[in-house]
Amino acid sequence: MRSPQTSEKTHTMAKTLQNITDLTLQQLTGRLAEMKEPAWRAKQIHEWLFSHRAESFEEMTTLSKALRKALEETFAITPPEVEQHDNSTEGACPGPTEKLLLRLPDGAMIETVLIPGPGRLTACLSSQAGCALQCSFCATGSLGFKRNLTPGEITGQANALNSMLAASGREQKITNIVFMGMGEPLLNTLNVFDAVETLSTRGYTSSISQRKITISTVGIIPEIAKLATSGMKTKLAVSLHSAFQEKRESLMPLAARRYPLDELQPVLAHYAKNTGEPVTLVYMLLEGVNDTLEDARQLIRFASRFFCKINLIDYNSIVNIPFQSVCSETRDRFRDRLLEAGLQVTLRKSYGTSIHAACGQLAAKGMEHSNKS
């Protein structure tokens, strides 16, 4: 962790200089052309930033001193600072679930999570500080919306997780990314798209195929339409939680009213048809709320009209939020009804509940210290 003096200096620089990690390779190439530098320099610098995770231009020893000085006068490098590192090993999980509380240069706090699985290591990234959507089962919504994250603040989370792995001597590599952390990715679409472009750039030791990156949304219809024609190869997950409009409004009041199911369904069908990829419908089972066979039948009616798969997930307990998870018998009965209808269904196990790292639990623990200098 950097010293307070370093943090203060970095924050001051960030006020006047652009964070170079906010730039995609193409954007950096354009900026360097203005500095009369060849295009290949951009790839060289990006490799320092995202393969070697350099935190200063002085570390970029393959660049001339003159260029390093010019870069230092033009750009800043402002990685997030790790405020807290929690880990938890649970049940059949093949390794520890780890959560980092990160401080951004302006003092905003976010969380990112590393989730192990059989043959994979998934990074759960945040796209916003806080969230404006106020979903009733989600801790992040209780924070309110602070601001969108920049592309560099998004990729910086992956860098922080990779640095954590390297510091512990592990040779593991992040294999998958899910935008299921704090915030709504499709209310920060351009920055998320730029971050995906950087994270998936071939040739970096940390690069990840876009096919292994999932963007999760509450169902922002115009942005899903953009994603369908963007040419990106990412996967799409939609937080559904009920196929009854009125019930969905009670769970997700802002998103469900603004983007009703009868308008969302055809857009998801268009996405699936245009991309050839299934939409993942995420359905959190809540005891006595959305767990009946009638709920299952309504979900079948909604999901049978387009190429999709369904992830059933358990509710993860959150302080002051009065929902309960369903028992295994209820969950299995619900799943079996979907399977009988010919739908593809997966029961997703959540890990990291004891450290508040599971779905819906991210609330930037330590947010009360976000004004610390």
Curated annotation (Swiss-Prot):
Binding site for S-adenosyl-L-methionine: 183-184, 216, 239-241, 316
PANTHER family cross-referenced by the UniProt entry: 23S RRNA METHYLTRANSFERASE, RADICAL SAM CORE DOMAIN-CONTAINING PROTEIN
Enzyme Commission identifier(s): 2.1.1.192
Record-level Gene Ontology MF annotations: 4 iron, 4 sulfur cluster binding; metal ion binding; rRNA (adenine(2503)-C2-)-methyltransferase activity; rRNA binding; tRNA (adenine(37)-C2)-methyltransferase activity; tRNA binding
Gene coding for it: rlmN
Reported function: Specifically methylates position 2 of adenine 2503 in 23S rRNA and position 2 of adenine 37 in tRNAs.
GO process terms (BP): rRNA base methylation; tRNA methylation
Origin species: Chlorobium phaeovibrioides (strain DSM 265 / 1930) (Prosthecochloris vibrioformis (strain DSM 265))
Localization, UniProt: Cytoplasm
Domain Radical SAM core: 117-356
Cofactor note text: Binds 1 [4Fe-4S] cluster. The cluster is coordinated with 3 cysteines and an exchangeable S-adenosyl-L-methionine.
Protein name (database record): Probable dual-specificity RNA methyltransferase RlmN
Note: Reaction proceeds by a ping-pong mechanism involving intermediate methylation of a conserved cysteine residue.
